[in-house]
Amino acid sequence: MNFARDVVDAADPSALALVERARDGRRREWRFAEVAEGAARLAGWMRARGVGRGDVVMTLVGNRPEWVMAMVACFRLGAVVLPCPEQLRPTDLARSVGVVSPTLVLADPRNRATLEAAALGCPVAYVDESGLFDGPDVAEAVTLRPLDPCLLTFTSGTAGEPKAVLHGQRYLAGQAVQAEHWLAPARGDLVWCTAASGWSKSARNVFIAPWLRGAAALLHDARFDPAARLELVERERVAVLCMAPTEYRVIAARVPLRAAPALRGLVSAGEALNPEVLRIWQQATGLPIRDGYGQTETGQLTGMPAGGEIRPGSMGRALPGTRLWIEDGELVADPATVPTFFLGYLGADGGGEAPGGPWRTGDRVREDADGFLFFEGRTDDVIISAGYRIGPFEVESALVEHPAVAEAAVVAAPDAERGSVVRAVVVLRSGFTGTPELARELQEHTKAATAPYKYPRVVEWADELPKTASGKVRRAVLRDSG
C-alpha cells in the first residue's frame, strides 16, 4: 500500500484536487496531476538530503497546497510526517523535536522567527525555496505495509507532557470508513474541513478522507472570521462543511445564517454541541449538524450517519465494524475492530507499543436504548476549549514559572461560545497581591510560554489549593466552586 501511489497518482490527472484561497486573497485550483508531480519532486528533493523510510519529517506550514504536498511526499517515501500547528511556541517545538528527532523540518517562511528562537538543531527548509517542488529528481512511491509507520500527532497531555502518538499506514486507508459513513461527500464535491494543519482532525479530514471519496478539498489559509466563513461556503459552492463546535457556536451567535445553494452536509467533532445551536443551524440551513467522536490514538470511532436518524446532542453510533461498549460509565473500544488504531507512543516518558486488550478512552459516555451515544465529560481533567484539547499540567507549569506564583491549578470553566475556557486558580508568593494587572501579566506570560490558545481566560486568587491527603490537587473541588 502507498497513499501517494494508490490515491493521488491513481486519480484522474485532470480532476480537481484542491481549491486554494491564500491569505493574500489569491485563488487557485490544483489538479491531481499538479499535486502528484509537486509531491513526487519534493520527495526526490528530500531523498537527496537523506530522508528515507521511517525518518521523521516535521511540518510547520499553514493550510496551503505546500503542506498537502509535503504530507503526500512523506507518504510517498515511507517517511513519518509530524504536522505541527503554527500556533506552537519555541518551547513547544523544541520539546517535540526532543521526542521525535526529525531528520528535516519543512516550514512556512512566516514561521522563521519562531523556528530560529527554538534552535532545533536539525535541518530546516522553507517551502518558498527554489527546487523543492520543481526539482529534477522524482521519487517513486515505495511499497509499504499496513503497520509501517506513517504519521505522528501529539496528545494534549493531561497528567504530564503531551505524548507523541504514532500511526501506521493503515491509518490512511482506514479513513475510508468515516469518509463513507460520516463525512460522506460524493464524487466531485468540494469539502471544507476548517481545522488548522497540525491537528488530528486536519490530518484526516482536510484532504485524506475527501480524496478517498473522489472529492476535492478547500484550503483557506486565513484566520477564522464568521461572516467570511459563510461567504466563502457560498462562493466556492462547498458541499460538505466540517467545523469545530466553537465555530458553529460563534457563527450562530454573530452572523445571520442562511442556506447555501450547494451545501448538503454539516459535520462536527471535538465536543458536544448544545441543542440551541443545533436548532439555529437546522432552522436556517435545513441541514442537521452531524456529530462524531474520536481520539488522537484511535481516529474516529463514532458518527451520526448521513441520511440517517439524527439525535440532537448525540455523537452518533459506532462506525460500521467498530466495537464499542460502556464499562462503569466509560467508553471502551476493541482495538482489533478499529482500522485507525495507533501503533504506540514515542519518547522516553510515553514510549512503547499501544496497549493490548480493550482501549479505555477516559471519556464518560451514556448510551440510549437505540445505541446512540452521548458524551458526558472526561474521566481525567483535560479541558476542551473551542475544539482544542488542553492539558492542565502544561498551563500550570507555565504559570508557576512566573516569579509571583507559588502554586496554580487549572480547570475548565463553562463558556457560551467556546464550550469551556481555561480557568486558573493561583496561590501567590509572599509580597504579591492579586490584581487585574497581575492577572493580565500572567495571561501574557502563559501565551509567551506555550501555544496562545492555552492561556487562562479566567484568573482567580486563592490562599491555598484543595488537596488530597497525599498532596494531589483536588480539581473536582475547584470545578464545582467555579
Give the ranges of each region predicted by the language model.
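Structural core segment of the AMP-binding/adenylate-forming
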Residues: 7, 48-49, 72, 76-134, ...
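Gly/Ser/Thr-rich phosphate-binding loop
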Residues: 238-243, 252-310, 323
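AMP-binding/adenylate-forming catalytic core of the ANL superfamily
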Residues: 88, 105, 241, 364-454, ...
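Conserved AMP-binding/adenylation subdomain of ANL enzymes
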Residues: 173-193, 197-240, 254
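Conserved ATP/PPi-binding loop(s) of AMP-dependent carboxylate-activating enzymes
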Residues: 317-321, 328-355, 390
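Conserved AMP-binding/adenylate-forming core of the ANL superfamily
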Residues: 18-64, 68-72, 89-94, 98, ...
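Conserved AMP-binding A3 loop
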Residues: 29-33, 150-174
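Conserved pre-ATP/AMP-binding loop-to-beta segment of ANL
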Residues: 13-16, 137-154, 161, 184-190
